[in-house]
Amino acid sequence: MYEVKLKVELEDKVLEVTQGTTPYDILCDYFKDRKDVISCRIDGVYSDMSSEILKDCKLELMTFEDDGARDIFWHSSAHVLGNALVNLYPDAKLVHGPPIEEGFFYDVDVTDPISSEDYEKIEEEMVKIMKKNYRFERVIKSKEELLEAYRDNPCKTHFIMKGVDKESSVYRNGDFFDMCLGPHIRSTGVIKAVKVLKNSSAYFLNDPNLKSLQRIYAITFPSKGMMDEYLKRKEEAKERDHRKIGTELDLFFFSKYSPGSCFFLPNGTTMYNTLIEFLREEYRKRGFKEVITPNIFCTQLWEESGHLQNYKENMFIIEGDTFALKPMNCPGHCVMFRHQDHSFRDLPLRLADFGVLHRNELSGTLTGLTRVRRFQQDDAHIFCTKDQVKEEIKGCLEFLSFVYGVFGFRFELVLSTRPEKYLGSVDEWDRAEKALADAMDESNMPFKINAGDGAFYGPKIDITLHDALGRRIQCATIQLDFQLPQRFELKYRDSDGQCRTPVIIHRAILGSIERMIAIILESFGKRLPFWISPRQIAIVNMGNPDYVGKVRSVLARFRLDVIDDGNTLSKRIRTAETSGYALVCVVGKKEAEANEINIRFNKSNRNIGLYELRDILDRMADEKVELDSILPIDKVSISK
């Protein structure tokens, strides 16, 4: 029988293989030592390792370090979790099991409530399935076959009726199968370690009027070492939980009287305002104009912007659907742009807004400062011509790099390109994507491409931040928008006097101020960067109130507190150190007589020594590298 030979480009090689060869065959034949491969891409598309190669192609072997491959690994693990739940709870009806930012979950309709006491047996059942090394086999079934297979599962039936035309795929491992488009890892044995993390309730389709389900969260890894490292980080994260630190530093609290809306105490308000003032100073340098827009708009605005049709469930609607609290600033900025006539000379127009936003998050999803209903963003919208897009994006990237550099955060960039459903022409999209790619290239910022994941209104750059605990968090966003200017009929006059439609660049760097405060707290713990800390200096008073007052006046530019609680000197110093103060200044009789101050640097547990009061500011300036390696000492006066 005639064998068709194909060329497969892989890394720096071009392989000749027989038609029908699979990526797994190639892995075994040419890369036997690559034990870390869990998935693959064929011509840029994630595929099963068992997919037959039918034409010349480019093959990429993917590891757990790749975002897409990791999602595939966790999606496959969700199938194993579903299999275990069906084995343990015979009446269980599986609903939905996607990968998430950290692991995966499965929603299940089951009679018996699942609790933390069940985690161990669920893990044990999953390990049994993993050890059996079942292959993930893709099987095509007709719509009728699927409806018959899930006749007792109304939730799956809903998905079939809504999403399946004539046929769809299921993935089988052993006797278990689940409806899924894939792709998946090769077998359950690729999974080497599992941990059930938590469980909660969840509504079907996130609708409180529909069935209540049980949601089980878990995480898996392709090696036990990775799991050990993850659990160690989790323990560190517990100690650095921003809710715990926020309580200990008197920063903020939450109340049942306003779920999802934070009460910022004086210390927290200082930190909040310092972040905003830091950005305001940068806005002035970078040509942004800060504006204030209303918090509440009539629903006509949200109809015009398209948010009422596509975002209503996340909005707070009041007065019989007449008004709504704004969940984002862009429609208000469009109204502001439209209010005045603009020529090409006015562009780019960079509008920044710290307005309060509200989003109607489900109560079960609210989590400290990271998921709230009321928040503020460092939100900005740049109105520009198409020819200005690249330079404006470069400016956004430089701004982003500067701000994240201030906190020592690393980040990654991903260019998300034209999706299947999009507005505008292909040529318009191609030029916009090229402008974004060129901006990143010219900024010497490497990036990956996430094909087809752009918003329907324009391509975007997704920015993933790496915090001090190694977690990946998306805060910043840079998005091009062709649609909103058209919906609001925004115009400017070009050099020929012709009316043109501008492009909008949506841009946020910190994202939610609340969420960024949580990230900062969990990255630095109580020892915050000096410039942003609400507790910069503690003056330990040993019975010299007059001299303490003199010291306070000299250090008035800093945020300081006096510790005068009647305890011994060592206990007062200990109180100052454990309360997060960067500098501890001891003021006693000896210091008062010599007109000196004794300074202790908390971060390195180092005694700086005795200095004359008149020299203290110069000495602190000399210490600026250690005091705060992020910003020079003169930055600490941003917010007093």
From Swiss-Prot:
Gene Ontology CC annotations of this record: mitochondrion
TGS domain span: 1-63
Protein's GO biological process: threonyl-tRNA aminoacylation
Keyword Transcription assigned: no
Subcellular location: Cytoplasm
A Pfam family hit: HGTP_anticodon
Enzyme Commission no: 6.1.1.3
Keywords attached to this entry: Aminoacyl-tRNA synthetase, ATP-binding, Cytoplasm, Ligase, Nucleotide-binding, Protein biosynthesis
Catalyzed reaction equations: tRNA(Thr) + L-threonine + ATP = L-threonyl-tRNA(Thr) + AMP + diphosphate + H(+)
Presence of the UniProt keyword Methyltransferase in the record: no
GO molecular function: ATP binding; threonine-tRNA ligase activity
InterPro entries found in the cross-reference section: aa-tRNA-synt_IIb, aa-tRNA-synth_II, aa-tRNA-synth_II/BPL/LPL, Anticodon-bd, Anticodon-bd_dom_sf, Beta-grasp_dom_sf, TGS, Thr-tRNA-ligase_IIa
Family: Belongs to the class-II aminoacyl-tRNA synthetase family.
HAMAP family in UniProt: Thr_tRNA_synth
NCBIfam families given in the database record: thrS (TIGR00418)
Protein name: Probable threonine--tRNA ligase, cytoplasmic
